[in-house]
Amino acid sequence: MRPELSQYTHVSAGKVREIYEVDDERLLMVVSDRISAYDHILEPEIPDKGRVLTAMSMYFFHNIDFPNHLAGPIDDPAIPEEVLGRAMVCKKLKMLPFECVARGYLTGSGLKEYQETGTVCGVELPEGLVEASKLPEPIFTPATKAELGDHDENVSFDVVVEKLGEARANELRDATLRIYSEAAALAEERGIILADTKFEFGLDEDGRLVLADEVLTPDSSRYWPADGYEEGKVQPSFDKQYVRNWLTGPKSGWSTDDVTPPPSLPGSVVEATRERYVEAFERITGKKFCEWIGCCV
């Protein structure tokens, strides 16, 4: 349910986030507990998910050396009490029309494309790679941003160049791969593999590239436990892949080819998903989730 924040104008809604205007220069981004998969918003919500995503984004915004969209602390006076801990005050930006994906391992849509063409978004890869193969080096695989309910479409780097120009496209690619590599090294120290992730960038009033939206959360990333890694198999994960696997497994009775919406998630899947999200936060940050602002109110 969308929070009714009467002091602000509601600007837009996504699958997970609600955006409100604070003033001429700032927005309030509120992260819900909604979870989406295969372009559907699922029922029921995952308890505490919005706070986990906000906590992880804040952690990485403060620990990754790159300009970001934050315009205030997590307890900024502009944040209403009812959304404290799952909202952040952000700068208004001109958002760029691409999801900037970095892949260090082959899985998901990247694996499917590789099996069909030997490439991912136009990047040629060696023969013989399988599920969860580590790539020789991380690759940049952009996608267009789809409207709510539509599919993001993987595109080649050339498409980014055509849309944004060579200099800006190179800047996007370099930033994406640098941030991914920095975060992957941090995760590795904590016994976790960052298989892939996606970023969104915008431009500030000076035309400077700024990291925005969410960053390195279990919604936007695939996190695998390093001690269970085995090439050629679907990996256990600390992200919403667990939900995707249940939806496409025999117990759900649903298929991605169905025209009907997915079924409601059973309580066991909801709780297991919450546990995975919380564990991802605690293992990567070294912090206790119960100490995050708003968790014990």
From Swiss-Prot:
Pathways per UniProt: Purine metabolism; IMP biosynthesis via de novo pathway; 5-amino-1-(5-phospho-D-ribosyl)imidazole-4-carboxamide from 5-amino-1-(5-phospho-D-ribosyl)imidazole-4-carboxylate: step 1/2
Keyword Nucleotide-binding belongs to the record: yes
Catalytic activity reported: 5-amino-1-(5-phospho-D-ribosyl)imidazole-4-carboxylate + L-aspartate + ATP = (2S)-2-[5-amino-1-(5-phospho-beta-D-ribosyl)imidazole-4-carboxamido]succinate + ADP + phosphate + 2 H(+)
One GO location term (cellular component): cytoplasm
First-level EC class: ligase
Record-linked Pfam families: SAICAR_synt
InterPro entries, per the entry: SAICAR_synt/ADE2_N (IPR028923), SAICAR_synth (IPR001636), SAICAR_synthetase_CS (IPR018236)
One function term, GO molecular function aspect: ATP binding
SUPFAM superfamilies according to UniProt: SAICAR synthase-like
Keyword terms: ATP-binding, Ligase, Nucleotide-binding, Purine biosynthesis
Documented EC number(s): 6.3.2.6
GO BP terms in the entry: 'de novo' IMP biosynthetic process
Family under the similarity heading: Belongs to the SAICAR synthetase family.
Name this polypeptide is given: Phosphoribosylaminoimidazole-succinocarboxamide synthase
Organism phylogeny: Bacteria, Bacillati, Actinomycetota, Actinomycetes, Mycobacteriales
